[in-house]
């Protein structure tokens, strides 16, 4: 058992929380075994969890490509990341834009944020909660769920990712 208030402790706590929220299982040895990768496995998703005590996480294209590749090898699961900032104070879901649309998530909520991506001409992007803290000014349509959104697209690679608060991701996932 990891000592309380260590990164390992926070990571274990995050993995258990993510697994529970997805009705999934925590991967043995946190994905270190050759036959089971990533941190959490559900029927639909292969999830890589990252936690930091900072108010940002630097997501590299290499990290994303690794979970994406593992998800395909693992039985055609969708790659998903859960980034915990400030020791879990804020959690952000990151997924491919094509999966986001394929699951109709783009239709199940009203989003604050521009679905036109920020173009990232680098091999990393800083993930922060800044996009979440803006007031939600739009009038909601009946039955729509309000959700903050940030899209990024790595150039010249074309990888388009969508970031939304983890709690919103779970709520939208559970919508009919």
Q: What residue ranges belong to the model's regions?
A:
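Catalytic phosphate/metal-binding cores of nucleic-acid and nucleotide-processing enzymes, i.e., regions
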Residues: 1-176
């Amino acid at each position: 058992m990891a000592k309380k208030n260590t990164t390992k402790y926070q990571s274990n706590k995050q993995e258990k929380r993510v697994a529970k929220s997805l009705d999934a299982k925590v991967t043995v040895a946190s994905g270190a075994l050759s036959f089971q990768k990533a941190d959490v496995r559900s029927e639909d998703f292969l999830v890589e969890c990252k936690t930091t005590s900072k108010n940002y996480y630097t997501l590299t294209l290499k990290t994303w490509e690794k979970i994406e590749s593992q998800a395909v090898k693992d039985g055609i699961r969708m790659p998903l990341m859960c980034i915990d900032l400030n020791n879990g104070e804020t959690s952000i879901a990151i997924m491919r834009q094509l999966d986001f649309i394929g699951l109709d998530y783009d239709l199940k909520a009203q989003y604050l944020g521009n679905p036109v991506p920020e173009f990232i001409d680098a091999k990393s992007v800083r993930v922060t909660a800044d996009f979440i803290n803006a007031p939600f000014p739009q009038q909601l349509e009946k039955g729509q769920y309000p959700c903050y959104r940030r899209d990024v697209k790595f150039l010249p690679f074309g990888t388009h990712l969508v970031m939304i608060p983890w709690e919103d991701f779970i709520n939208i996932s559970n919508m009919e």
